[in-house]
Regions:
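Class I SAM-dependent methyltransferase SAM/SAH-binding core
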Residues: 64-122
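Core SAM-dependent methyltransferase catalytic element
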Residues: 218, 224-247
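C-terminal alpha-helical "lid/dimerization" subdomain adjacent to the S-adenosyl-L-methionine
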Residues: 18, 22, 165, 169-220, ...
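Conserved alpha-helix/loop element of class I SAM-dependent methyltransferases that forms part
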Residues: 44-63
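N-terminal auxiliary segments of SAM/dcSAM-dependent transferases
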Residues: 1-28
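A short SAM/SAH-binding and catalytic strip from SAM-dependent methyltransferases
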Residues: 131-145
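A short glycine-rich, Lys/Arg-flanked "PGG" loop and its adjoining helix->strand segment in the class I
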Residues: 146-158
Length: 247
């Protein structure tokens, strides 16, 4: 199954169509710009959403976690605080990795955490070596969702769990006008004032709108043989946690 984003020649970069081969560099530039101010995307509510992700995952000291697009270190540190086992943090963006590692080092939280610069669509991780795979706010930025999901399944051991936390599509119609106003008018202006880069935040908003809705992403997961799929909407569907297993 091809990615919901792409054709054979172009793919979506926000609302723009760009050559497939250029998207990774464009996304990298965005995250180089926003690495230290990514909290603006949710006004900090992402912390509650990540707590919900970890609640559902239930960390275990014998389970190895791979956190993809995890350069901020948030999921890794939360997993360790809750008694989880070793963590591999993988991110395509070196600036995000450095920001995350620096943040965790200040609090002495680097024990048993490995940092790897790598691509979600071609992970530098052996087959069947991971107990749990998480990706928080990263799947919508890949060029091919299908390739990223296939890679997730490849690295999971049988019985391993896939979990994705991502901005999604509001399920409550009453919140949509306010959500649209914040997304398209307020957030890009905050980005301009704080980071001097309005376009980076504009892309992030557009990437959310181009991302498959909850049911569509569930179909993508099933298409690569991830099984027992389910999801939970957070904040009325502004964000969603998806869960699946390699059986």
């Amino acid at each position: 199954m091809s990615s919901p984003y792409s054709t054979s020649e172009t793919t979506s970069f926000g609302f723009r169509k760009v050559p497939i081969e250029s998207k990774k560099a464009l996304v990298r530039d965005v995250f180089n710009s926003v690495a230290n101010n990514y909290d603006l995307m949710s006004f900090g509510v992402h912390r509650l959403w990540k707590a919900s992700l970890l609640d559902w995952l239930s960390p275990h000291p014998d389970k190895v976690l791979l956190d993809v697009a995890g350069g901020t270190g948030d999921i890794a540190s939360r997993y360790k605080r809750r008694g989880g086992g070793p963590v591999i943090v993988c991110d395509i963006n070196q600036a995000m990795l450095e920001a995350g590692r620096s943040k965790l080092s200040e609090y002495g939280k680097l024990s048993d955490i490995t940092w790897v610069c790598g691509d979600a669509e071609s992970l530098p991780i052996p087959d069947r070596s991971i107990d749990a795979y998480t990706i928080a706010f990263g799947l919508r930025n890949v060029t091919s969702i299908s390739k990223a999901l296939k890679e997730a399944r490849r690295v999971l051991r049988p019985g391993g769990r896939f979990m994705c936390l991502e901005f999604s599509h509001p399920a409550i119609s009453a919140i949509i006008p306010a959500y649209n106003a914040y997304s398209f008018k307020i957030l890009p202006e905050i980005g301009r004032l704080v980071t001097k880069d309005r376009d980076a935040y504009k892309y992030l908003v557009e990437s959310i709108r181009k991302f498959p809705n909850q049911k569509e992403l569930e179909k993508c997961m099933k298409s690569v043989n991830l099984e027992k799929t389910s999801y939970r909407n957070l904040s009325g569907g502004i964000a969603t946690i998806h869960s699946a297993w390699r059986l």
